[in-house]
Every structure is written in C-alpha cells, then in structure tokens.
Amino acid sequence: MLVLINTIQEQASEAIKQATDIVALEQIRVDFLGKKGKLTELLKGLANLSAEEKPKVGQLVNQAKQGISALIETKMIELKEKQLLAKLAAEQIDVTLPGRNHSTGSLHPVTQVKHRINDYFSRLGFDIVEGPEIETEFYNFEALNIPGHHPARAMHDTFYFGDGRLLRTHTSPVQIRTMEQRKPPFRLIAPGRVYRCDSDVTHTPMFHQVEGLLIDKQATLAGLKGLLQDFFAYFFGRELALRFRPSYFPFTEPSAEVDIECTQCNGKGCRSCKFTGWLEVLGCGMVHPNVLIAVNIDPNEYHGWAFGMGMDRLAMLYYGIDDLRMLFENDLTFLRQF
C-alpha cells in the first residue's frame, strides 16, 4: 500500500510539472483528488484493511493528498502569473501615440445670432432684459393697447392655459414690465422665446424674437431708421438698402414694416425673395401713447420707438438656410456646419 501511495504521488508531481495551462492543471486535480480520483479510491479501500492498518494507511493517504494539493496551488499561482504576463504583452499600449481628442461642440446658429445682436446693442448702451414666458393677458395684450374686444387679437393664435394665463406671443411684455419698474429715459432689448400656433417651412410653434425699445424726450422715427440701417450693415457685414412700408400694429403709431435688400441676389430678384428683391425682416414704429399711459409715463413729455424681429429669420438669412424647421430638429450633421 505504501508503494502504491508513493507511486500516485510521483505520478501527480510529474503531471503537475508538465501542466502548461490552468485547464490542464484543473484536470489533474480531478484525476487525483476528485470524487473518483486515485487517492479518493484508496480511501474507499480502507474498509478492507485491518483495524491496525487503517489509521496508518489513512494518515499516509491524507499526507499525500495535502502534498498534491500544495503542488497544485503552487503551480496554479505560477500559471496565473504567466497568463497575466502574456495578456499584458498582447495588450501593450504604446504610450508615445498621440491621444484622441473629444469632438468639440459649437453654439447653435440661433444662439450665435442672439450673441451678435446682444453685442451690437450693448455697445450702444442698451440693457438686455428678460422676462417670464408664461404671461397674463394684461401684459401680453391689454397693456399693449390690445383690449379683449380688439380685432388685432385674432392675429395671435395663442396657447392658453386653463387659468387664463398664456404662453407669450412676443417679448413685448418684457418691455411693459421694465417700463413699470424704471423711470425714463432708458433703452433696452428683450430677446427670448415666444409661442404661436403655427408650423410650416417659415414658422414654428416656438421661435426666437428680439424686441427693442427706447423711451426719451427726443426719440424720433428718423433715429430709429438710422439705427436699423447701421445694425443691418453690422450684422451682414455690408451696407444694405432698407425699405419702410406703412403698416399697422396696435402698440405703435405710426407703424412700419421694414424690408432689406435681398442678401442672396443683392436686390435683383430670386426665389428667396420671390423675385421682388426685398426680404421682410421686422416691424417697428413709435410707441403708442396708450402704451405709455398704461405704465404711468406721460406721453406729452416722453416719446419712444420700438421694433421687433425674429432671430430665427435672421439666422436663416445669414447662413442661407431654406427651411426654418431645420434649426430645431437637432440634426448634428446639419448643426456641425456652424
């Protein structure tokens, strides 16, 4: 029995030395120490031995089992180290290679247009003011000379809330709130999001607008015209012809709509301007006396002018975009151009 135990130990030791990977080593463990392994079979045979031989043989088998387990554990550590070194060698990183930069984003074209507008007017001393997008009918309509029965309200397809509040249809409410809080003279612009029930190639339910306001004792329509001529020359980088057409807005009197020379054909006529040579860009006029009275400003002492234009419309003209909806579809392929 002693010879058999020694033979099994030698076989196990040799097999462990020859093992080249963890799978082979695990198979050796099963062959010698598993439920049907060689040493396990010896332990099962103790029942056939005499009472005197059982303790001695059992002790020898357990010693052999411990010795083989120790050899397997040592070999396992060795194989794992080799496996790790092989993996590191295969996955070696060349630290001298240049890194990969993350793609850099850019400002949305409408945001870029907003910044250009803000830069221009802030240099002229205009304050940039903002206000709530959820408004009351007073600030959105009534204070702007648009009472409940006024037919001009039909011009605004408005988003109403159940409690009578609404999504503002222009940024004019910001001007009303500012005039309530400040004493003239002052000048300001109010950029922001506005909302109307409209959606097509040139309209979206939400769009961006900027309105300007100046209240002074000597405000004139001629001064407004000169300012707008200078602004569009700055914005488009060249002098453009302007055309003022008489119009009607409840909050200004007189009122005008302003066209600029087509930026695509230089006024010669093309599809962009519907072959007229002109592009409509804004509405303006002298602030109506009723608007001044609504905010406790004496119209006999102070006068003012106001204008409003769509920033999305300016972005389309500046960048040559045909469909307004492209600005809001979050298409990175399109937006990366800017």
Curated annotation (Swiss-Prot):
Binds 2 magnesium ions per tetramer. It is an enzyme of class 6 (ligase). GO terms for cellular component: cytoplasm. GO terms for molecular function: ATP binding; magnesium ion binding; phenylalanine-tRNA ligase activity; tRNA binding. Gene3D superfamilies: Bira Bifunctional Protein, Domain 2. It is found in: Cytoplasm. GO terms for biological process: phenylalanyl-tRNA aminoacylation. The keyword Transport does not apply. Keywords: Aminoacyl-tRNA synthetase, ATP-binding, Cytoplasm, Ligase, Magnesium, Metal-binding, Nucleotide-binding, Protein biosynthesis. Its cofactor is Mg(2+). Belongs to the class-II aminoacyl-tRNA synthetase family. Phe-tRNA synthetase alpha subunit type 1 subfamily. This is Phenylalanine--tRNA ligase alpha subunit. It comes from Legionella pneumophila (strain Paris). The gene is pheS.
